[in-house]
Amino acid sequence: MPATRARTGRWNADVTHYAILCVDRDVAWFAERRLDDCVSREITIRDIMSGEVACVEKVIAFNPAEHTADDVTADIAIAIARRLDPSDSVRSELLDFVETNAGLAFTRGLRRTELAFEAG
């Protein structure tokens, strides 16, 4: 009898899943994340804020059991903006994401991280 594979996570259709659509140089893909991470709004926000997921274009929330899907990009961008500390500098990509999806008002007072290059 063949050995059965252990399952690390179990898919549940009746929860909200968060798919992160990324785009870079006209190539689009959905970020590959653990199933447990995909059903957590908090982990989705954390992954975007930390840079774990880059080139974020959209965040789609869907529940297969309820046949619902929503573009929650603006909601996620607003949640991120509210967590940013004005005394810290913010990665350019993250600041652009918030500005594009939440609006300019949410980026006022935030500082962009400036990249420094050293001649060598």
Model-derived features: where do they sit?
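Extended, compositionally biased eukaryotic interaction scaffolds
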Residues: M1-W11, T113-G120
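Long, low-complexity intrinsically disordered regions enriched in acidic and polar residues
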Residues: P2-A3, A28-E32, D36, F97-T100, ...
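N-terminal non-cleavable signal-anchor helices
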Residues: T16, I20-D24, I60, A77, ...
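A short, charged, amphipathic alpha-helix used as a generic interaction element across diverse proteins
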Residues: D26-A61
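Residues that form generic nucleotide/phosphate-binding pockets
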Residues: D47-I48, A79, F97
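Short, mixed-charge low-complexity intrinsically disordered segments
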Residues: G51-S92, L104-T107
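Intrinsically disordered, low-complexity terminal/linker regions enriched in Pro/Ser/Gly
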Residues: R91-G120
